[in-house]
Amino acid sequence: MNLMLQNLNNIRTLRAMAREFSIDVLEEMLEKFRVVTKERREEEELQQRQLAEKQEKINAFLELMKADGINPEELFAMDSAMPRSAKKRQPRPAKYRFTDFNGEEKTWTGQGRTPKPIAQALAAGKSLDDFLI
């Protein structure tokens, strides 16, 4: 709870702060607190109603499943029994060719970190187009 809310929650602090305001201002603040409290109650009631409706729907589906002879655990068993097809992404084709520091010719797709030999050549003024395959 932040400091302002702690002050509002402490009766002695409220009394001390109230001395600085007129009764009209205090009544206006009180009305605003009532409005905020009412809105908050309505929000919580709405959430409770939505949760109750959701639970009723779940119970209705469970009853329908029991009436048809379907056990809820069977649904989960079916889901785990089916193998998931993980899509294997094809590797990207090489886009650039360069010679590394050991004299070996290597390729780079253009994805990820720029290899050091290419980065040094770019810093020296070469263009990336010079390395295109």
Swiss-Prot record:
Matches recorded under Pfam families: Histone_HNS, Histone_HNS_N
UniProt feature, compositional bias: Basic residues: 85-95
Record-annotated disulphide pairs: none
Ranges for region Disordered: 81-115
Keyword Transmembrane helix: no
DNA-binding region: 111-116
GO MF: bent DNA binding; DNA-binding transcription repressor activity; minor groove of adenine-thymine-rich DNA binding; protein dimerization activity; structural constituent of chromatin; transcription cis-regulatory region binding
SUPFAM superfamilies reported for this sequence: H-NS histone-like proteins
Locations listed in the record: Cytoplasm, Nucleoid
SMART domains, per database record: HNS
InterPro entries hit by this protein: H-NS-like_N (IPR054180), H-NS_C_dom (IPR027444), H-NS_C_dom_sf (IPR037150), Histone_HNS (IPR001801), Histone_HNS_N (IPR027454)
Swiss-Prot/TrEMBL keywords: Cytoplasm, DNA-binding
A GO cellular component entry from the record: cytosol
Family under the similarity heading: Belongs to the histone-like protein H-NS family.
Task of the protein: A DNA-binding protein that acts in a fashion similar to H-NS, repressing gene transcription. A subset of H-NS/StpA-regulated genes require auxillary proteins for repression; these auxillary proteins (Hha and other similar proteins) may also modulate oligomerization of the H-NS/StpA complex.
Protein name, per record: DNA-binding protein StpA
